């Protein structure tokens, strides 16, 4: 009995000692100071730069990097974190629109342990990179928005409007984009009536930036623009054809037409599949201008990372196979970036870090090491279709990270082309680029 009592007393003393250890006095005031560990006390920063990513699925890097087990080598946040020798944390959530991110940052309903951890990270971060706004557009009915855009542009021509940009901002933006947020005409037009529309992308974006600076006034804040993922067969634009089963059991398209309803509607406005990308870019750039306009109106607050422009430059410069190679930047859902797309986003962000004097000194060497390690671990086995030695030589001879990544992806990309599995029309097939499947079991 005495032994049990002694054990209990010792345990109580130990607990009290630990608790007292978390409280100290401020030497200038003799007031007690709470030294209870926070989430960040479990990080070993070791004097390194802390970079935090927050935003949507593009930043989260769950959809796109393939195989997912290589996310920490393919996703752009990891490439930048490792390559610059940063302490890095990704707090992005797939599917987030601007309103959801704003709510997460401000609403008391989200003040759980995970949200508290995110807040502490944002307060401590040296650099934050934000990826948002893409879902405000792409997660809604993009095909419908394209048709509505055609309608508005036609009205503009009929009315003889001279200033296309003003017309689009005043009419298209207020109507179409707020429909995208609400899908309810009365609520969507609330802002036009002078009421605050909490689902408006422009207002949300401004509030997000202000909130981040409230949390961390000294942070360097990078904001990505949204790339254009639209091609002539984009599932973002085209719904499936309307079909019916004939009396003999044969599935047929309505009106014996393999085109979808939306294809027909767009064609009525003189828009061919080859022009979907241009029309889609018209909408995407309206969304990107929210970021650019904020940067111009609030100088010194955000650094714009022009993902859109770099992707577009690559697309416009690529004329091989009817500009097919620019599709390598996208995963097979043709929405999210592929491994190669993530590498390009990393390149653009790294250029900005270099411009700001925030980049690590050994980025190129680190990227080369990552790619060579992957080659050795995943593709160096008997019978491998990848010439590992040649690929490593090309990587090590590269003078930029872009060249090193390109050498790697060229080596592991299969040369065969595959038609889209669910392609509706043979003459609308396009190549799908796939990677050599890693063989972890048989590597040397």
Regions found by a protein language model. Give the residues of each.
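Beta-rich interaction/scaffold domains
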Residues: 365-444
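Serine-esterase "nucleophile elbow" of acetyl-processing enzymes
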Residues: 32-94, 119-120, 150, 416
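Bacterial N-terminal signal peptides that target proteins for export
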Residues: 1-9
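Oxyanion-hole/transition-state-stabilizing segment in secreted/luminal serine hydrolases
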Residues: 100-196, 222, 226-239
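Substrate-gating cap/lid alpha-helix
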Residues: 231-307
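Histidine-centered active-site loop/cap adjacent to the catalytic His
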Residues: 326-366
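Structural recognition of the beta-strand scaffold that forms the well-ordered cores
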Residues: 50-55, 59-61, 87-92, 126-131, ...
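C-terminal motif of bacterial Sec signal peptides marking the signal peptidase cleavage site
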Residues: 21-24
């Amino acid at each position: 009995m005495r032994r049990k009592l002694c054990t209990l007393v010792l345990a109580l003393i130990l607990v009290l000692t630990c608790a007292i250890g978390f409280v100290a006095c401020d030497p200038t005031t003799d007031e007690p100071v709470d030294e209870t560990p926070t989430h960040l006390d479990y990080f070993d920063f070791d004097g390194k730069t802390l970079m935090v990513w927050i935003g949507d699925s593009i930043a989260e890097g769950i959809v796109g990097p393939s195989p997912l087990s290589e996310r920490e080598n393919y996703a752009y946040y990891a490439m930048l974190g490792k390559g610059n020798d940063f302490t890095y944390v990704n707090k992005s959530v797939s599917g987030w629109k601007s309103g959801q991110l704003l709510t997460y940052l401000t609403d008391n309903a989200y003040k759980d342990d995970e949200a508290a951890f995110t807040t502490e990270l944002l307060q401590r971060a040296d650099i934050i990179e934000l990826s948002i706004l893409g879902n405000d557009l792409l997660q809604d009915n993009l095909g419908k928005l394209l048709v509505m855009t055609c309608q508005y542009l036609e009205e503009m021509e009929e009315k003889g409007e001279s200033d296309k940009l003003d017309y689009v901002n005043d009419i298209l933006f207020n109507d179409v984009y707020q429909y995208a947020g609400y899908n309810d005409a009365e609520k969507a037009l609330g802002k036009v009536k002078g009421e605050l529309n909490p689902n408006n992308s422009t207002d949300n974006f401004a509030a997000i930036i202000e909130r981040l600076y409230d949390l961390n006034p000294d942070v360097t804040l990078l904001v990505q623009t949204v790339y254009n993922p639209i091609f002539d067969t984009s599932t973002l634009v085209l719904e499936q054809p309307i079909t019916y089963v004939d009396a003999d059991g044969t599935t047929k398209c309505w009106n014996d037409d393999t085109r979808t309803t939306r294809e027909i509607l767009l064609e009525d406005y003189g828009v061919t599949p080859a022009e979907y990308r241009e029309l889609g870019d018209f909408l995407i750039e309206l969304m990107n201008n929210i970021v650019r306009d904020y940067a111009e109106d609030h100088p010194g607050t955000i650094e714009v990372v022009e993902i859109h422009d770099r992707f577009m430059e690559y697309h416009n410069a690529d004329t091989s196979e009817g500009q097919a190679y620019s599709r390598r930047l996208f995963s097979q859902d043709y929405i999210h970036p592929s491994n190669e797309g993530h590498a390009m986003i990393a390149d653009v962000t790294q250029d900005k870090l270099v411009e700001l004097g925030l980049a690590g000194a050994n980025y190129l060497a680190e990227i080369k090491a990552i790619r060579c390690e992957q080659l050795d671990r995943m593709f160096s086995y008997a019978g491998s279709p990848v010439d590992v030695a040649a690929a490593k030589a090309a990587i090590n001879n590269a003078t930029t990270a872009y060249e090193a990544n390109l050498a790697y992806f060229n080596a592991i990309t299969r040369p065969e082309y595959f038609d889209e599995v669910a392609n509706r029309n043979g003459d609308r097939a396009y190549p799908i680029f796939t990677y050599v499947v890693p063989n972890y079991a048989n590597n040397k």
